[in-house]
Amino acid sequence: MDKAQQDALKKAAGIEAAKLIQNGMIAGLGTGSTVRFLVDELGRRVKEEGLEFTGVTTSRRTQEQAEGYGIKIVNIDDVDHIDVTIDGADEVDKNFNGIKGGGAALLWEKIVATNSNKIVWIVDESKVVDTIGKFPLPVEVIPFGAGQVVKKFEAKGYKPVLRLDANGEPVRTDENNYVVDLHLERIDHPQELAQDLITTVGVVEHGLFLNMVDQVIVGDPNGPRVMDNPNK
């Protein structure tokens, strides 16, 4: 699948998901390439249909895009609930376990998700996998002692790589932390791994989102298809 085909599937999923947002809602808006198409469609609806809703974003990038369309964006602490959050995912398996954080927004994404009544992911078909882990697992760490955390991960065989930008500098999250990507190839015991990561001193959050999502909208060549989590 080339990039144009993949973008077409992402756009279709984003447009389908935008239908979930109705007047008066408080909606969480995620981060990433698929979410950009979602926000484009919501911006169109605001302009052409008079849609009025309030957004809570998981990154400054999404906030800037949404505000460019005139969408009202507020801080998460200014709302008492979030009706639905729509976000992307880097991988999702049949058990509705996912990896997120390819865009370095995993901490804000998880905070918004855990405060949402409903969580929806939008992905193209390449993101649906049998077993998660082929996509490197992002882990957000504080800069102080980051090298020591990397050494601990190396000793455990997690194959960590500090994420760098085009200038060779560590990528910074919106909270000014670093991201370490774990090249695991496959994750057979995600719950155990999640517990090990979050109890490592220096780790702020990890990109494992386990059985959190309620619904996945998949951009498919035959049209968007919906996967509902039977456990939710």
Curated annotation (Swiss-Prot):
Gene Ontology CC entries for this record: cytosol
Active site: 109
Residues that bind substrate: 31-34, 87-90, 100-103, 127
The EC number(s) this enzyme carries: 5.3.1.6
Domain of life: Bacteria
UniProt catalytic activity: aldehydo-D-ribose 5-phosphate = D-ribulose 5-phosphate
Keyword tags: Isomerase
Enzyme's top EC category: isomerase
GO molecular function: ribose-5-phosphate isomerase activity
InterPro entries hit by this protein: NagB/RpiA_transferase-like (IPR037171), Ribose5P_isomerase_typA_subgr (IPR020672), Ribose5P_isomerase_type_A (IPR004788)
Keyword presence, Isomerase: yes
CDD domains associated with the record: RPI_A
Subunit structure: Homodimer.
Reported function: Catalyzes the reversible conversion of ribose-5-phosphate to ribulose 5-phosphate.
Protein known as: Ribose-5-phosphate isomerase A
Native source species: Bifidobacterium adolescentis (strain ATCC 15703 / DSM 20083 / NCTC 11814 / E194a)
